């Protein structure tokens, strides 16, 4: 199996402020967290784990032969949870790259994850994250994050406001991060920053501390489930792909 030096970690917390027990909500016949895990698992990375504080989530994943790492319920962010899980992986000294996949993207394409891994290994960036080209109508909601980049694809700034101002086309940021191990270790040691707290975007902590984030272009914007309305969209999309036999 390739990529033995890579770990994929899916942080999943049971309590959500906007959607009760979000990971256990059904999309079709299976839960949100099951769908995320099954999609990610198509990347065929041996070290693929769900990091959670919940026995219920753990039981769901174990039933489909997934691997679970228990983490503390008081961990502040998904990235911090991913790091705590990484430290508990057996023989983790052989792992040099950690992919943090948000646990609310039920139709994430495994090809996007493989592209992140390839780009991370073949660049000098501390972190790599995927983006999709979209029009203004696609990013009006403040839950959608855009990124401004330089001509090489290096991230300059992330915002919940459409950036750059006046553009007709934007780069929509997907909530997946590929970290070099030393970059993840540095990130979790840093205090929250002004811009991070202002925008409520933890990736700004990275930029404010002089670390580099490279972006890689992917084709599709996967549905992210954060609200009841998002869940309805995901269920509708699931019915559509089932009807098409995809």
Curated annotation (Swiss-Prot):
Give the subcellular location. Answer: Cytoplasm
- Name its pathway: Nucleotide-sugar biosynthesis; CMP-3-deoxy-D-manno-octulosonate biosynthesis; CMP-3-deoxy-D-manno-octulosonate from 3-deoxy-D-manno-octulosonate and CTP: step 1/1; Bacterial outer membrane biogenesis; lipopolysaccharide biosynthesis
Q: Name the UniProt key words of this record, in alphabetical order.
A: Cytoplasm, Lipopolysaccharide biosynthesis, Nucleotidyltransferase, Transferase
Name the Gene Ontology molecular function terms of this record. 3-deoxy-manno-octulosonate cytidylyltransferase activity
Gene Ontology terms: cellular component: cytosol
| EC nos | 2.7.7.38
Matching Pfam families, A to Z? CTP_transf_3 (PF02348)
Q: Name one GO biological process term.
A: CMP-keto-3-deoxy-D-manno-octulosonic acid biosynthetic process
Coarse class of the protein's main subcellular location: cytoplasm
Q: Which reaction does it catalyse?
A: 3-deoxy-alpha-D-manno-oct-2-ulosonate + CTP = CMP-3-deoxy-beta-D-manno-octulosonate + diphosphate
Query: Which InterPro entries does the record match to this protein?
Result: Cytidylyl_trans, KdsB, Nucleotide-diphossugar_trans
Family from the record = Belongs to the KdsB family.
**PANTHER family in UniProt:** 3-DEOXY-MANNO-OCTULOSONATE CYTIDYLYLTRANSFERASE, 3-DEOXY-MANNO-OCTULOSONATE CYTIDYLYLTRANSFERASE, MITOCHONDRIAL
Q: What job does this protein perform? A: Activates KDO (a required 8-carbon sugar) for incorporation into bacterial lipopolysaccharide in Gram-negative bacteria.
Instruction: Output this protein's name.
Output: 3-deoxy-manno-octulosonate cytidylyltransferase
- Give the species: Rickettsia prowazekii (strain Madrid E)
Q: What is the lineage of its organism?
A: Bacteria, Pseudomonadati, Pseudomonadota, Alphaproteobacteria, Rickettsiales
